[in-house]
Design a protein with these regions (language model features):
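Short glycine-aspartate micro-motif
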Residues: 17-19, 95, 105, 147-151, ...
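N-terminal beta-alpha supersecondary unit
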Residues: 13-90, 96, 100, 129, ...
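Short beta-strand scaffold segments in enzyme catalytic cores
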Residues: 27-32, 149, 157-161
């Protein structure tokens, strides 16, 4: 979006950002006041759906997002009205995860956020979800840059120099598997081992 938006107490008025996340296996929508106060937070998990496959299946995940996206958005608007008297027209900007993540999944949340921005004539803010991992700490702590961060998520393990919440430099990262991927491989191997032991008991 070409619209500019000033966020925070220094802007002189309250800001309400609706953020949509759909990078992997959870469809989430939240509304945050002035960057710190969560007035709505809705998550639709797909854990049970993917458990039978031993991991996230991208095509199934994307379909699940499509089924859940309108539900979580409607619930977020309902929570915002109940908790703070906020209507959809009061939203200052709409944000959506642009990556990294599963392409089909990302598109669901991204299209929803951009559509809402268009309908309500508000700015759209694209968010890198790794950056969001860092910024999320500011919701309930007074953690302010500059600082060094160790980011460990499902697909990334990085050491980051955080100059500000909008400017970070990756100082180092794993060159093959991230810690989360290593955990996943161990879990899959263990599951196969347990299945083999169970089968042996039956013979």
């Amino acid at each position: 979006s070409n619209k500019e938006i000033e966020i925070g107490p220094e802007s002189g008025f309250d800001n309400y950002i609706m953020a949509i996340e759909s990078s992997c296996d959870e469809t989430a929508c939240a509304i945050v006041k002035n960057g710190r106060e969560v007035i709505a937070n809705v998550v639709a998990s797909q854990i049970k759906t993917h458990a039978q496959y031993g991991g996230v299946i991208p095509e199934i995940a994307a379909r699940e997002h499509m089924e859940s996206i309108n539900i979580v958005i409607d619930e977020a608007f309902s929570q915002a009205k109940e908790n703070a008297g906020i209507e959809p027209e009061d939203i200052t900007a709409f944000a959506g995860t642009v990556g990294p993540g599963l392409v089909g999944c990302l598109l669901v949340g991204l299209n929803a956020a951009k559509t809402l921005a268009l309908v309500y004539d508000r700015p759209f803010i694209g968010v890198n979800h790794l950056n969001a991992h860092l910024c999320g700490n500011y919701l309930d702590t007074e953690l302010r840059p500059p600082f060094m961060a160790l980011l460990v998520s499902g697909g990334h393990t990085q050491i980051i120099d955080v100059e500000s919440y909008s400017k970070q430099t990756i100082l180092g990262e794993t060159i093959d598997d991230a810690v989360g991927e290593a955990y996943d491989k161990v879990a899959v191997s263990y599951t196969h081992l347990r299945a083999h032991e169970t089968l042996s008991d039956l013979v």
